[in-house]
């Protein structure tokens, strides 16, 4: 049996998912205490630290794809755009989209409402403190391993779908417009995700709605993780978020378009993403890699920090219904192309990152079936 699966069962049996293994320290509080050095828990091993070369923006960037004209009443209507998305999903696992249909004013309002929330006094934010059971609320770590290395970030996690998990009482009530703005923002990103899913299906020669059906039709899951990366006294020693691939289906990121931070691993090189104004960054998650039998790739990425400016980003996750098995689609497997992954529900799959924290691509790769 796979060791990672054993670890997850042990952690769950012990009940350690009900509370954090040690007192939570808010990274924002550390940053605002004018530290001259970095606490040991946030210092990454030398092999994981960003280098000066990797910090600097390069001429290389993830693809930027203009979606204007792609979606019409008659269906998907532009083969050139479709081909660019297909190439990005197979070669990069990441791409930016412009003319995506979400109003720039809504994007700005969403980001600035959350920035205002994180600027609230710590005591006010503690009202929303989370636990590792669901991660819902205000948090500062991933994984429940005692003494584990930590990332230089705080976050807020909330559910948007299914509706029975969407609880406004667990959403911040300040600033006054935040609930209304995030509710509208979530609805718009659910629509955008559904449109992109149609493209992903069609590009594999499948029915437009095949991926959506595999995710549970209208019963999909959607959630939002808002990341706050404070200034860091020694950014060359730390990471805002350790290398990982996203465990869910698809991620749509609203980046901080004033401060670079997201890096994508391409051919063993870390590429610093340069956000295009009012673009979303889309990336393939592990569940779509599994459904496509590894035709589409989830890709390792991380976040670097800096000593001069804070960063705020919003990661929207579009996920399968949590209790249905996800496995390679029958239309994409054959005698010559057997299924690479066994069936597993998303509930089972995401326990790994909730217990172990970010671990590169080790989780999805550990489930590859032996040939």
Curated annotation (Swiss-Prot):
Jasmonate binds at residues 225, 350, 354. Belongs to the iron/ascorbate-dependent oxidoreductase family. One of its GO terms (cellular component) is cytosol. One of its GO terms (molecular function) is dioxygenase activity. The gene is JOX2. The lineage of its organism: Eukaryota, Viridiplantae, Streptophyta, Embryophyta, Tracheophyta. Changing residue 346 to Y: No effect on enzymatic activity. It catalyses: jasmonate + 2-oxoglutarate + O2 = (1R,2R)-12-hydroxyjasmonate + succinate + CO2. 2-oxoglutarate-dependent dioxygenase involved in the oxidation of jasmonate (JA), a stress-induced phytohormone synthesized in response to attack by pathogens and herbivores, which triggers the activation of defense responses via the JA-mediated signaling pathway. Converts JA to 12-hydroxyjasmonate (12OH-JA), an inactive form of JA. Is specific to free JA, and cannot oxidize the bioactive form jasmonoyl-L-isoleucine (JA-Ile) or other JA-amino acid conjugates. Prevents over-accumulation of JA and indirectly its bioactive form JA-Ile under stress response. GO terms for biological process: cellular response to toxic substance; defense response; negative regulation of defense response to insect; regulation of defense response to fungus; regulation of jasmonic acid mediated signaling pathway. This is Jasmonate-induced oxygenase 2. It comes from Arabidopsis thaliana (Mouse-ear cress). Residues 219-320 form the Fe2OG dioxygenase domain.
């Amino acid at each position: 049996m796979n060791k990672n699966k054993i670890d997850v069962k042990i952690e769950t049996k012990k009940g350690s998912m009900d509370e954090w293994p040690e007192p939570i320290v808010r990274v924002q509080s550390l940053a605002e205490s004018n530290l001259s050095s970095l606490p040991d828990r946030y210092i990454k091993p030398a092999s994981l630290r960003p280098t000066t070369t990797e910090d600097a923006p390069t001429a290389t960037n993830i693809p930027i794809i203009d979606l204007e004209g792609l979606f019409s009443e008659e269906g998907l209507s532009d083969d050139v755009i479709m081909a660019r998305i297909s190439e990005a999903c197979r070669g990069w696992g990441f791409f930016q989209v412009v003319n995506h249909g979400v109003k720039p004013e809504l994007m700005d309002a969403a980001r600035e409402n959350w920035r205002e929330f994180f600027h609230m006094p710590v005591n006010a934010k503690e009202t929303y403190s989370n636990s590792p059971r669901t991660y819902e609320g205000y948090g500062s770590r991933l994984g429940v391993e005692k003494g584990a290395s930590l990332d230089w970030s705080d976050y807020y996690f909330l559910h948007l779908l299914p509706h029975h998990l969407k609880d406004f009482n667990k959403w911040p009530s300040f600033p006054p417009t935040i609930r209304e703005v995030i509710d509208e923002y979530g609805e718009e990103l659910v629509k955008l995700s559904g449109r992109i899913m149609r493209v992903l299906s069609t590009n594999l020669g499948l029915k437009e709605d095949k991926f959506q059906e595999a995710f549970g039709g209208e019963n999909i899951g959607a959630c939002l993780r808002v990341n706050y990366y404070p200034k860091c006294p020694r950014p060359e020693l730390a990471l805002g978020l350790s290398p990982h691939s996203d465990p869910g289906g698809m991620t749509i990121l609203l980046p901080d378009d004033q401060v670079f931070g997201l890096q994508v691993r391409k051919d063993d090189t870390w590429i610093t993403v340069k956000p295009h104004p009012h673009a979303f960054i889309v990336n393939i998650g592990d569940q779509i890699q599994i459904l496509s039998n590894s035709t589409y790739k989830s890709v390792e990425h991380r976040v670097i920090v800096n000593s001069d400016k804070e960063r705020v980003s919003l990661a929207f996750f579009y996920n399968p219904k949590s209790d249905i098995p996800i496995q390679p689609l029958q239309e994409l497997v054959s005698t010559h192309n057997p299924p690479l992954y066994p069936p597993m529900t998303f509930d089972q799959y995401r326990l790994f990152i909730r217990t172990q924290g970010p671990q590169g691509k080790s989780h999805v790769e550990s489930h590859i079936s032996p040939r």
